[in-house]
From Swiss-Prot:
Keyword set includes Nucleus: yes
Keywords (A to Z) from UniProt: Chromosome, Nucleus, Telomere
Effect of residue 68 to E/S/Y: Causes telomere shortening
Biological function: Component of the telomerase complex involved in telomere replication. Stimulates RNA/DNA heteroduplex unwinding which favors the telomere replication by the telomerase.
Effect annotated for changing residue 115 to A: Impairs interaction with the telomerase RNP and causes telomere shortening
Gene for this chain: EST3
The protein's name: Telomere replication protein EST3
Annotated localization: Nucleus; Chromosome, Telomere
Effect of residue 68 to A: Reduces ability to dimerize and causes telomere shortening
Superkingdom in the source lineage: Eukaryota
Outcome of swapping residue 49 to A: Reduces ability to dimerize and causes telomere shortening
Mutagenesis / variant outcome for changing residue 72 to A: Causes telomere shortening
Amino acid sequence: MPKVILESHSKPTDSVFLQPWIKALIEDNSEHDQYHPSGHVIPSLTKQDLALPHMSPTILTNPCHFAKITKFYNVCDYKVYASIRDSSHQILVEFSQECVSNFERTHNCRITSETTNCLMIIGDADLVYVTNSRAMSHFKICLSNISSKEIVPVLNVNQATIFDIDQVGSLSTFPFVYKYL
C-alpha cells in the first residue's frame, strides 16, 4: 500500500501555535499612513490573559499573539530591539519600556535572558515605519540588505509574556517579511 502524507504533515512545524500572520498583518495595514503608527494591529490583553495564557480564549483563537524571538539586536533606554517570527516570516520588533519592565517583574528575569526561540505571547502592538538610518541606529542592522524600500514596518510591542519556555530552535531559516513587500 502506498504511503500517504497528509497535507498537515507535509511541512514540519516547531509549534502548533505558530501560524503565518506577519505578512498578512503588514499587507492589511499597508494602506495606512506610513508616517504615523497604526493603532493596535495586535489587540491588548487583560491581566488574566497574561497570567494564564494557556487558558485564554482571546489568545488561543488569535494566532497573531504567538511569536518566537529570533534575535536580540540592541538594548537602549530600557527598550529592547529584536526580531520575532511566525511560522514563515520574521519582522523587526521594539519592546517598549513598559513591556520590558512588566515582563522582568513578572518573570523575575531579563527579557533578553534565555528567551531566544521561546514561544512568546505578545499584545497591544502598533505598526510603525522606520527609516534605514533609524533601523541602523536602534537595531544595528543594515536594512539595505533586506529591503529595497526606504522605510520598513516595525512592530512596537507593549505586552509580552512567555507561553512556552522551551528554547526549541528550527533547522529552517525564516526570511524577513520585507523581501516580500
